[in-house]
Amino acid sequence: MSDIGVYNAAFGPDRAGLRNLKRVFWNLEAPSLYEQALQRGEAQLAAGGALVAETGIHTGRSPKDKFVVRDSGTEDQVWWDNNGAITAEQFDRLHADFVAHAEGKDLFAQDLYGGAEPAYRVRARVYTEYAWHSLFIRNLLIRPERDALGAYEPDLTIIDLPSFKADPARHGVRSETVIACDFTRKIVLIGGSSYAGEMKKSVFTYLNYILPKAGVMPMHCSANVGAQGDSALFFGLSGTGKTTLSNDPARVLLGDDEHGWGPKGIFNFEGGCYAKTIRLSREAEPEIYATTERFGTVMENVVIDPVTRLPDFDDASKTENTRCAYPLPFIPNASATGRAGHPKNIVMLTCDAFGVLPPIAKLTGAEAMYHFLSGYTAKVAGTEKGLKGPEATFSTCFGAPFMPRHPSVYGNLLRDLIARHHVDCWLVNTGWTGGGVGTGRRMPIRVTRRLLTAALDGSLAKADYRRDPYFGFAVPTSVPGVEPHILYPVKTWADKAAFAETAKRLVEMFQANFKRFEAHVDADVRAAEPTMSIAA
């Protein structure tokens, strides 16, 4: 085996069981990784300088193919209702087969950090079969200084082999695709998928497992910081506006996806962004658009013209989940440290396609925990499913696939931190108003931004409020610059009876979903549930 690049020879591939490799390319930077990816036919060069790769049959994550080793260390720690389990023996066979599959191959290794706060960061070493995967994860995680690589000792090892195919009978998995996490031995194996997001989410999953033990709250959220040092968190599932709304020219961007909240404040887990590009426009999101025209950015499943190499961000023929991955410094107003003080505001974003939630509501600590555990949004059902109306989605903690522990662990941590630091909490509906999908309209972005500005500058906390008769939370009666009727969802509907019926239906969905958490929360959180006595 020959080595190319800088690394700590005392912690070589043998520490991960890897042997008889052809070559290992250590900690290569973007120019070298471009050369390797292009020479190997892994990717193409776009007109603006970005590297463009396709992921094949997997154009998104494979949550049903993700497994955690169930052993004495994890038996009572992992939420097994939400996490697939394999035995240590099955993992041993899988690992042995990964090692055998890697023999004679070139691998690319990156030594990186997950976590901008040194006291809580994890040193993640990522071995990849593809050069473009190596560039992707280098963009997404935090890059150590060059002179630190010689002494780098990994805490977590990820082996990413897209050409490996798992054997369900032998390995105890579901298909040829596998993401297997051994928290005890600190190894993650990814096989059968070229979707690069599996790597970053594996680091996130590991941090979500280890940090609560240290009293640190891991969060699937974006974050930004105001001119006075006031930080804000934005929770939200895909399509709710998490990336767009946190990317505010008047505030410093801390990060777009994963953060921790510890004794000193909040910190980014990552050193880059993984933004959706479908229907991306220069006018609507100029900062993100500009990254697609830069050398160093990786674009995933974006269609490019074979002659001009210009990207077509409106083309969803490969997938709706087209992405670009770039280092945070590519965003002009990004934080240089990835750290900030304790948040002053928490915003929980939902895209309510039923059109019955108000555009903003102020939450108590108990209500914030209720809605955090619920993790509600709604999506418009695709015609291929034959559904005419919206489809409710409840993803606890706004990121159920990445949460190894029971949601109450994260919910209690969040509630304690909210109380300790006197954080104002808000529920913001970026979905529909005046009716649901088909009869109403999307909440105007100018309204959402005006409401967020008022929430983040502190003025909205002093407003007059009414109690929502269906969902129980406090809704402002007026906000300067916002039409008063839009704050009263029922007033935006022409058919008041249809509004009442739709609101009642959504209330029932909340109640049915929350039954699984009732035994794990205090009475005041149970009391924060939407009130059917009025909705009936």
Swiss-Prot record:
One of its GO terms (molecular function) is ATP binding. Belongs to the phosphoenolpyruvate carboxykinase (ATP) family. The keyword 4Fe-4S does not apply. Disulfide bonds: none annotated. InterPro entries: PEP_carboxykinase_ATP, PEP_carboxykinase_C, PEP_carboxykinase_N. It catalyses: oxaloacetate + ATP = phosphoenolpyruvate + ADP + CO2. It comes from the Bacteria. This is Phosphoenolpyruvate carboxykinase (ATP). Mn(2+) binds at residues 201, 220, 257. Binds 1 Mn(2+) ion per subunit. It comes from Methylobacterium sp. (strain 4-46). Substrate binds at residues 61, 195, 201, 323. Keywords: ATP-binding, Cytoplasm, Decarboxylase, Gluconeogenesis, Lyase, Manganese, Metal-binding, Nucleotide-binding. The gene is pckA. ATP binds at residues 201, 220, 236-244, 285, 323, 448. Involved in the gluconeogenesis. Catalyzes the conversion of oxaloacetate (OAA) to phosphoenolpyruvate (PEP) through direct phosphoryl transfer between the nucleoside triphosphate and OAA. Its main location: cytoplasm. Its cofactor is Mn(2+). One of its GO terms (cellular component) is cytosol. It is found in: Cytoplasm. Pathway: Carbohydrate biosynthesis; gluconeogenesis. GO terms for biological process: gluconeogenesis. Pfam families: PEPCK_ATP. Its EC number is 4.1.1.49.
